[in-house]
A protein has these predicted regions:
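Helical element adjacent to the flavin cofactor pocket in flavoenzyme catalytic cores
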Residues: 166-216, 220-224
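C-terminal catalytic lobe of FAD-dependent flavoproteins
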Residues: 318-400
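Short beta-strand to alpha-helix junction loop
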Residues: 80-86, 119-128, 167-185, 299-308
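Dinucleotide-binding Rossmann-like beta1-alpha1 core, especially the glycine-rich loop
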Residues: 40-151
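Glycine-rich FAD pyrophosphate-binding loop
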Residues: 16-38
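Central helical "cap/lid" subdomain
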Residues: 31-32, 216-264, 303
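Active-site lid/adjacent beta-loop-alpha segment flanking the redox-cofactor pocket in flavoenzymes
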Residues: 260-355
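N-terminal Rossmann-like FAD-binding beta1-loop-alpha1 element of flavoenzymes
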Residues: 1-24
Length: 400
């Protein structure tokens, strides 16, 4: 297993559940990069299908944007990988208990409804709250409800009066680093080993990978190899004759504390997000297309401009945030597709190799897809076949 982020740790854990031990190699450590800095919000899966119906941006309009924040372009749907969202979301409450027992770590899971705020002007233009809910109702099986301004102000007294209410839908959250750590420790108890080192190349025999070569000169033997290395997938996938296109982008957010705790409900408006966490902290972020910065040079430096924009934006939504104390300004590289839709995972077996696999390019959703991605990849590696319940998904997301 190359990569000790949420995806790699999940695959290692689920392989362990099948009696298959892993050696997880990472040039740094467990969840040091984006997985440990994520928002770690598990969104109710059908929300994305409903969201697609609200998107009218033509494909050609997306070209040249740093990153499009929608998940779709005409002719391509998140339905191809919706199973990853759905299975992960539906499993999380049980998974949290499982990881506490097997990994010895409280991942701080809790339900956190998410509300997309709507101004009076937007409500009038849409023709009322029922019109705003219609795309969600049309999908079927989507829990989306209108919460009016009075109810929101009971929860958030300082909410900007321009907001008349919001569309609320289910969501959950975990603490990102603790989540990956729990999976890693659970995997270790099932026989996994974690090794620090940078993989430079592979040793092969015919159509099989026999091991990996580390920068230190060490060679590690392997019965199978999985690449779960996010935006660094390019070079190693090319060595296997199947270069995977990837666009490294940078996203960042703020961890903050307030004198009083906020209710566990996410607020979103104008591409600004306020995410109260179970531990009393608040994640503050801006998430528009302009806020994903192309970092093909793999520069992971933080932006003071983005920090100030986030602080100003969230304070307009919830003025009490002017009293926030910044605990950490953090960010890291994400793996996006090189062309629209920019968020499209790659999962499966490399076509020219019997025992080489990949799970990458999850964009900013790696943590929230990792439970299902790990389980499905483990089944594929163990049985050599795509799981029937996700066969079409594997066909659409396969490398090559």
């Amino acid at each position: 297993m190359i990569g000790a982020g949420a995806i790699g740790c999940s695959i290692a854990y689920h392989l362990g559940r099948r009696g298959i031990t892993s050696r997880v190699v990472d040039r740094e450590s467990i969840a040091v990069r984006a997985s440990g800095k994520a928002w770690a919000i598990f969104t109710y899966a059908p929300y994305w299908l409903a969201f697609e119906r609200c998107v009218t941006t033509p494909a050609e309009a997306l070209e040249g944007l740093p990153v499009e924040t929608t998940k779709t372009v005409p002719g391509v749907s998140v339905a191809d990988w919706l199973f990853l969202h759905e299975a992960s979301y539906n499993r999380m409450a049980e998974f949290a208990i499982e990881l506490a027992e097997r990994g010895g770590v409280d991942i701080e899971y809790c339900e956190t409804p998410s509300t997309d705020l709507v101004t009076a002007e937007e409500l009038e233009e849409a023709g009322g709250s029922e019109a705003l809910l219609q795309p969600f109702r049309a999908v079927g099986g989507v829990e989306a409800d209108w919460i009016d301004g009075d109810a929101l102000r009971e929860l958030f007294p300082s909410l900007n009066p321009v907001y008349e209410g919001g569309i609320s839908h289910p969501a959950g959250q975990v603490e990102p680093y603790r989540f990956s750590l729990a999976m890693a420790q659970a995997a270790e108890k099932l026989g996994a080993e974690f090794v620090q080192g940078e993989v430079l190349d592979f040793t092969t025999q015919d159509d099989r990978i026999t091991g990996v070569q580390l920068a230190s000169g060490t060679e590690l033997q392997a019965d199978a190899v999985v690449l779960a290395i996010g935006p660094w997938i390019g070079k190693l996938s090319a060595k296997l004759g199947c270069p995977i296109g990837c666009r490294p982008v940078f996203a960042e957010c703020l961890r903050a504390m307030l004198p009083v705790d906020l209710p566990l409900r996410t607020l979103a408006a104008d591409d600004f997000y306020i995410l109260p966490k179970k531990n009393g902290e608040v994640i503050l972020a801006t998430y528009g297309a302009k806020d994903f910065v192309d970092r093909s040079d793999f520069d992971a430096s933080l932006s003071e401009e983005t920090k100030l924009a986030a602080l100003e934006g969230v304070a307009r939504i919830l003025p009490v945030l002017e009293e926030a104390t910044i605990v950490e300004h953090r960010g890291d590289l994400l793996a996006m597709a090189p062309t629209p839709p920019y968020q499209k995972p790659v999962m499966g077996r490399f076509p020219e190799w019997q025992n080489a696999y990949v799970a990458t390019r999850f964009g900013g959703d790696g943590v929230c897809m990792s439970p299902a991605a790990g389980e499905l990849m483990a089944e594929l590696i163990d049985t050599g076949k795509s799981p029937l319940r996700a066969g079409r998904m594997f066909e659409r997301l396969a490398p090559g």
